[in-house]
Amino acid sequence: MADKILTPESQLKKSKAQQKSAEQVAAERAARKAANKEKRAAILERNAAYHKEYETAERAVIQAKREAKANGSYYVESQPKLVFVIRIKGINKIAPKPRKVLQLLRLNQINSGVFVKVTKATTELLRLVEPYVAYGYPSYSTIRQLVYKRGYGKINKQRIALSENSIVEANLGKYGIISVDDLIHEIITVGPHFKQANNFLWPFKLSNPSGGWGVPRKFKHFIQGGAFGNREEFINKLVKSMN
């Protein structure tokens, strides 16, 4: 009878290690899958809460306007906390000071746009560059469409499309911002981490307005029939034509 062939001890150890490694990989894969599922559920729950928050705020304004009208008074909206600023003029004939302000606002190219928190300081900056920019108060819809259609993040000085929530989480997760909709919420509410969220966003590259600027003289103030300056809620119409 032939001698029984024994598997060397080293071979047995290697086989057991490989089996353990395969089991560990499978366990880790299952754990990641469960964590991702939980994360997706949390994101959906947050998004639903955001949607409800936006709807509630909108209904409150409508109701307040109705009550004011019924009482024969006028509803005064709260001071806006956010503006969207678009550079509409190139580099020719710009004095050094406003040129520096445009750089500070990250508006280095014509048709580039950025969100700016309204403060006393930023209001002064906008006044200095008013002949070179159009700005106003963006709606939720405008902000959402901008981020989803033209949103890019600044990652290691590179311009990266916000194609996945994981890109946002990897860069802003430490601030509790783990999805594109979290990012939008932080911008629209001018939240506690607005600065970090806004700096993460690469300045938006917009197109020329579809159908042109629609004004006889572009470089006159908006209230005089031109294009530059504060156009308040009318900024939404302009962005829509450039997005």
UniProtKB/Swiss-Prot annotation:
The keyword Ribonucleoprotein applies. GO terms for cellular component: cytosolic large ribosomal subunit. The keyword Ribonucleoprotein applies. GO terms for molecular function: RNA binding; structural constituent of ribosome. PROSITE patterns: RIBOSOMAL_L30 (PS00634). Residues 18-28 have a biased composition (Low complexity). CDD domains: Ribosomal_L7_archeal_euk. Residues 1-31 are annotated as: Disordered. Keywords: Ribonucleoprotein, Ribosomal protein. Pfam families: Ribosomal_L30 (PF00327), Ribosomal_L30_N (PF08079). GO terms for biological process: maturation of LSU-rRNA from tricistronic rRNA transcript (SSU-rRNA, 5.8S rRNA, LSU-rRNA). PANTHER family: 60S RIBOSOMAL PROTEIN L7, LARGE RIBOSOMAL SUBUNIT PROTEIN UL30. NCBIfam families: uL30_euk (TIGR01310). Belongs to the universal ribosomal protein uL30 family. This is Large ribosomal subunit protein uL30. It comes from Eremothecium gossypii (strain ATCC 10895 / CBS 109.51 / FGSC 9923 / NRRL Y-1056). The lineage of its organism: Eukaryota, Fungi, Dikarya, Ascomycota, Saccharomycotina. The gene is RPL7.
